[in-house]
Design a protein with these regions (language model features):
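Extracellular parallel beta-helix/beta-solenoid repeat domains
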Residues: 1-171
Length: 171
């Protein structure tokens, strides 16, 4: 696929309340700087934050290279199953043949995607799913488990990573 990089935006998504959305809370897909901070993700039906990109189905833009997700609060996100709902935060490019992929899709540098200082208040296990990432940091986040809903998700892992390198995970 071809992407016009001169038409891609930088994104500052800050101070919002995202509540009761169907399918997902937010979707970001730009190679420029993306900052998601100080938001409340409250009962988003699908994944709260999706970093996507593909030339296979939706034909959305390409890779995310510089993403910071910080100081957000996630309350019982992922209460339903839709496309791209592998975790509360899903880094999920559409790659039909992952094992033969030559380059990583997202990131591309140490700390290309940083998830820090967030609070997850959740009834189920999956917090982060990442596929085809070079440079992922998850640090200083608080994960609290509640009993508001019965856990149901097929993904029983806090962190599920597929073809990810240069990863640092610490709660």
């Amino acid at each position: 696929g071809i992407e016009n990089l001169t038409w891609t935006p930088e994104v500052l998504f800050a101070g919002n309340t995202i509540r009761n959305n169907r399918a997902r809370g937010t979707l970001f897909s730009t190679p420029k700087k993306t900052v998601v901070e100080d938001n409340l993700f409250d009962h988003t039906s699908g994944t709260a934050i999706l970093l996507c990109g593909d030339c296979n189905g939706w034909f959305e833009t390409g890779a995310c290279r510089d993403v910071t997700i910080r100081r957000n609060r996630f309350i019982n996100a992922l209460t339903n199953m839709f496309q791209f709902t592998n975790a509360i935060i899903s880094i999920y490019p559409e790659i039909p043949n992952l094992k033969d992929q030559q380059k990583y899709f997202h990131g591309g540098k140490d700390g290309g995607i940083v998830i820090e200082d967030n609070e997850f208040d959740t009834f189920d296990a999956p917090i982060l799913y990442a596929k085809s990432v070079d440079g992922l940091i998850f640090r200083n986040n608080v994960i609290k488990t509640n009993t508001e809903f019965k856990p149901f998700h097929w993904n029983k892992n806090r962190f599920l990573l597929e073809r990810v390198t240069n990863v640092k995970i610490s709660e």
